[in-house]
């Protein structure tokens, strides 16, 4: 009698339904988005489905999916749809993937990039604590495949923390990435109410510091959500911590509750306050600060071109004039 292979079990949207907080907030006007439509949107969706790919746009219920897909851009989410962690802000499924990997994924992603004609690609992934290297080799292999099939295409890697293992970080850095990102997500005080207990404020900063020290020529980047109960003083502390750890670019966006079973929104931050935060960040020396209600780590990643000749720091001077090299 043939024994059937066990299928991974997971929790849909990453949160048990018993954790529901029955609060329905009316979103302000500035957070309203259009319904996804259009020929380009349909073509991107078709390519993603045909190549059995996952995108963070879909899995994380991103509000910008219509705008980004209609522009022919997407953020690819590697290593499946099941994350081994359960952050309380995130809609990605959580569970045990049982070591399963699609070994054809790097080639499929590279081909999709070619079919879409992308000049700038953002790669992210679920956490894979079930794998000895956290998926670092698979991540690096995907970057290499993209670069091989799409010469001139720039790649941003938004990685897991790999348990803080510097050798795993180096695997990705040595694959040819142009931007290395790891998200802080929130301020120090709120880290464990917001992120999985295995995540760490200090570890994320350590990963970013190691990335900058190992590859000074690679742009380092992080992202923080607002509206979870943080204060402006705590935000400034987080920005100072990022600068002290060599972070070049930081983004700020409004936290939006993906389901009723996730953390509630404490407040909606106005566009004017986002503008103030951007100016404060620039005054602290960031190469770029992107802040706005609908800003996400990879939002409009391909459109913010480095057009600051003569103003780049020495360690990034080689990037001047590079077409379509984005800061976020």
UniProtKB/Swiss-Prot annotation:
Bridged cysteine pairs (disulfide): none
Subcellular location: Cytoplasm
Residue intervals of the Radical SAM core domain: 69-287
Keyword match Metal-binding: yes
Cofactor: [4Fe-4S] cluster
Signal sequence bounds: none
Catalytic activities: [[Fe-S] cluster scaffold protein carrying a second [4Fe-4S](2+) cluster] + N(6)-octanoyl-L-lysyl-[protein] + 2 oxidized [2Fe-2S]-[ferredoxin] + 2 S-adenosyl-L-methionine + 4 H(+) = [[Fe-S] cluster scaffold protein] + N(6)-[(R)-dihydrolipoyl]-L-lysyl-[protein] + 4 Fe(3+) + 2 hydrogen sulfide + 2 5'-deoxyadenosine + 2 L-methionine + 2 reduced [2Fe-2S]-[ferredoxin]
Domain of life per record: Bacteria
Cofactor note: Binds 2 [4Fe-4S] clusters per subunit. One cluster is coordinated with 3 cysteines and an exchangeable S-adenosyl-L-methionine.
Residues annotated as binding [4Fe-4S] cluster 1: 57, 62, 68, 298
ATP-binding among keywords: no
HAMAP family named among the record's database cross-references: Lipoyl_synth (MF_00206)
Listed name of the protein: Lipoyl synthase
Species this protein is from: Deinococcus geothermalis (strain DSM 11300 / CIP 105573 / AG-3a)
This protein's encoding gene: lipA
